[in-house]
UniProtKB/Swiss-Prot annotation:
Pathway: Cofactor biosynthesis; phylloquinone biosynthesis; Quinol/quinone metabolism; 1,4-dihydroxy-2-naphthoate biosynthesis; 1,4-dihydroxy-2-naphthoate from chorismate: step 7/7. Its EC number is 3.1.2.28. One of its GO terms (molecular function) is 1,4-dihydroxy-2-naphthoyl-CoA thioesterase activity. It comes from the Bacteria. One of its GO terms (biological process) is phylloquinone biosynthetic process. Catalyzes the hydrolysis of 1,4-dihydroxy-2-naphthoyl-CoA (DHNA-CoA) to 1,4-dihydroxy-2-naphthoate (DHNA), a reaction involved in phylloquinone (vitamin K1) biosynthesis. InterPro entries: 4-hydroxybenzoyl-CoA_TE (IPR050563), DHNA_CoA_hydrolase (IPR022829), HotDog_dom_sf (IPR029069). Belongs to the 4-hydroxybenzoyl-CoA thioesterase family. DHNA-CoA hydrolase subfamily. Keywords: Hydrolase. This is 1,4-dihydroxy-2-naphthoyl-CoA hydrolase. It catalyses: 1,4-dihydroxy-2-naphthoyl-CoA + H2O = 1,4-dihydroxy-2-naphthoate + CoA + H(+). Pfam families: 4HBT_2 (PF13279).
């Protein structure tokens, strides 16, 4: 089952046109990512300040399907998946009520924080990813249908 994160769109999330500023949707998605880690029992303090490893985002994309305004109650549905020994990506779907309003993807690479070289994912992250394995298969099927 995908992880769901509930969020209200705040005034600070919007631009002069009154809709969510394009870069802020990634920030909101990242909040969902952090909530997913926390819910899985991963200490955010240790995860983000661990001096031995880091997980930088090396790719991000967003497709906006409808505008989001201040006060909107959205649900971020996310599914992380392992895509290599040292990387994973997270697929996000942002809903307003039952309407899909945006989709996003972030790709993360595990690196040694000192040498900045790639390293294999930690067991903690592999366990987190394994918790979503069945959902990953459904995401892949949906992506395949979109291409056709």
């Amino acid at each position: 089952m995908p992880f769901t994160y509930h969020r209200t769109i705040n005034f600070q999330d919007t631009d002069a046109a009154g809709v969510v500023y394009f870069a802020n949707i990634l920030s909101i998605c990242h909040e969902g990512y952090e909530a997913s880690l926390r819910t899985s029992g991963i200490s955010l303090k240790e995860f983000f300040t661990n001096p031995s490893m880091a997980f930088p985002i090396v790719h991000a994309s967003v497709d906006f399907l409808r505008p989001l305004f201040c006060g909107a109650q959205v649900i971020i549905s996310l599914v992380p998946q392992k895509i290599g020994a040292e990387k994973f990506e997270i697929n996000y779907e942002i809903y307003l009520a039952d309407v899909l309003v945006a989709k996003a993807v972030t790709r993360h690479v595990c690196i040694d924080a000192n040498t900045r070289s790639k390293q294999e994912l930690s067991m903690e992250i592999i366990q987190w990813l394994d918790g979503y394995r069945k959902d990953t298969e459904e995401v892949e099927r949906r992506k395949a249908r979109e291409v056709v």
